[in-house]
Amino acid sequence: MSKHSFLNFGIQNNPSPQYTRLQDGNESILEERYLRSCALKLAQQGDYTKAIALLSHLIDHHPENAVDYNNRGLIYFQSGDKDKALCDYNKALDLNSKLASAYNNRANYYAASGQLVAALADYEQALDLNPHHVRAWINRSITLRDLGEYAEAIENLETALLFGQLKGHIWAERGRTYHLWGDWNCAIADYRRALAELPFLKNQGGFSYSLRLQIENWLNELLFFED
């Protein structure tokens, strides 16, 4: 499982016919929305090059669109090009200083780079702008846990649970926090809650599959010591 709640992408081979239409310069508002959707699907399927090309062309036509920079930054990050990701996040925030998702994404960059204090500052900014940003609550809790602030990390995860989203993920992270904090009974209970919530998937490349596998490993580690 990734250290923070990043997306996990697979592989895509087929180009979108809408890409050719955009290259011809005949885009409409509806088509632009469709192309952004295509870029997301391409990225989720692992075809980062085509996804980035779509967003880059949209940016060329609308350089004032902060969301496109933020989305392209996320795909750069997922593809391993973290320097370009940071540049795009910064540009997105220059264009729209109230874009909570860009603060969350930039915080993920800082966390992955070991800059935990900078990450916390950006997560807090994201949550100030959007208190319902569940991923920012989860990510902030992981960063606090990395800093040894277990009690506050638990509080953040309990806040995240109030919104009724990503419960399996939240229970997994709360279980891991209890685990590292030494409260093994609470950890085991949360790991079991997470496994009951997460779907069983045959796709071994999916995020839920890798998350289940990680939780099972953590749980088995604790059950081994109990025996």
Label each region the model flagged.
Residues S2-P17, I188-D227:
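Terminal, low-structured helical/coil segments at or just beyond the last alpha-helical repeat
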Residues P17-Y34:
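TPR-adjacent "capping" and linker segments in tetratricopeptide-repeat scaffold/adaptor proteins
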Residues R36-Q44, V67-Q78, C87, S101-A112, ...:
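Conserved alpha-helical positions within TPR/SEL1-like repeat arrays
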Residues H57-D60, K91-D94, E124-D128, E158-L162, ...:
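Conserved structural position within tetratricopeptide repeats
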